[in-house]
């Protein structure tokens, strides 16, 4: 009776029955189904208002992020350090996956955000919060004979020993497609999922590779790697951060997106002499 009384009062106030009560079975009526949608929206609005009034240090909960391997190894350490400093109570759950796998995880609500490296993706169910073009380049050990050349042809490249990322990764597939368009094929002697490890192996003189520029930028600046100029194969991927269109943008998600945007703006800003 204690539980039934408020429902009865609500039904009287709305002027419509919310439940069908047949014996011990209780089901929502058509009016009940309609009201349920509004009730859920109202509760979500209250939760959002409560979250908006919290200080970052007070926000808790969990943030689940899927990332591309190269994004993880390059951008994540600094990003996580800054995020944890702002949101010390938030639990971070991270995983790496292929780009297709990450988008599927968003669709099935296994993760809150997906940080990909791929061609520009336009999907009506996803919101793209960050989009940064990233060139991919051929690299060789410093002192390699091809490093002294102004340009290198694809025909010359395929004669070299290569270490590449696994098939199914966006920029590896783009390389294979570029070669196929010129009637060529490249068979690496080693395939590896870690772009950062490939960079180190090329530095050791173990072969050539094809990697995002942000992975090799420090080694290029240090002179331990050389970038090869290959006019017939220009590849650009996009570093993109997504969330699902139907998902409420939580304070935890907003904080992460803001830090990614901030880092992107800082890296794009011209350095002053």
Where on the chain are the PLM-derived regions?
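Short, small-residue-biased leader/transition segments that mark boundaries at the very start
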Residues: 1-5
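A short LG(V/I)-centered, amphipathic sequence patch enriched
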Residues: 9-28
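Alpha-helical linker/hinge and terminal dimerization helices associated
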Residues: 13-16, 35-57
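Central regulatory/effector-binding core of bacterial HTH transcription factors
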Residues: 60-122, 192
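A late-sequence structural motif
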Residues: 75, 226-270
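Acidic, Gly/Pro-rich loop/turn segments at junctions of secondary structure
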Residues: 86, 97-160, 167, 215, ...
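Hydrophobic hinge/microswitch elements
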Residues: 98-111, 117, 170-228
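Secondary-structure junction motif
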Residues: 117, 146-147, 161-182, 249-253, ...
């Amino acid at each position: 009776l204690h539980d039934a009384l408020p429902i009865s009062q609500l039904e009287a106030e709305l002027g419509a029955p919310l439940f069908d009560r047949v014996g011990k079975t209780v089901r929502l009526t058509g009016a009940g189904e309609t009201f349920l949608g509004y009730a859920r929206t109202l509760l979500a609005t209250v939760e959002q208002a409560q979250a908006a009034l919290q200080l970052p240090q007070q926000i808790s909960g969990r943030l689940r992020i899927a990332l591309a391997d190269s994004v993880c190894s390059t951008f994540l350490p600094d990003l996580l350090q800054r995020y944890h400093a702002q949101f010390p109570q938030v639990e971070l759950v991270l995983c790496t996956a292929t780009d297709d796998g990450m988008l599927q995880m968003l669709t099935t609500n296994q993760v809150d955000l997906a940080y990909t490296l791929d061609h520009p993706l336009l999907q009506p169910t996803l919101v793209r919060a960050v989009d940064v073009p990233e060139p991919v380049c051929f690299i060789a050990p410093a002192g390699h004979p091809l490093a002294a050349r102004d340009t290198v042809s694809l025909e010359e490249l395929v004669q070299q020993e290569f270490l590449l990322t696994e098939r199914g990764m966006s920029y590896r597939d783009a390389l294979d497609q570029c070669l196929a368009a010129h009637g060529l094929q490249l068979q690496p002697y080693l395939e590896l999922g870690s772009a950062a490890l490939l960079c180190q192996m090329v530095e050791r003189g173990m072969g050539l590779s094809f990697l995002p520029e942000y992975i090799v930028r420090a080694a290029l600046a240090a002179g331990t790697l050389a970038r090869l100029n290959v006019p017939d194969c220009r590849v650009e991927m996009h570093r993109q951060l997504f969330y699902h269109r139907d998902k409420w943008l939580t304070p935890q998600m907003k904080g992460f997106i803001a830090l990614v945007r901030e880092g992107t703006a800082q890296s794009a800003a011209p350095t002053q002499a």
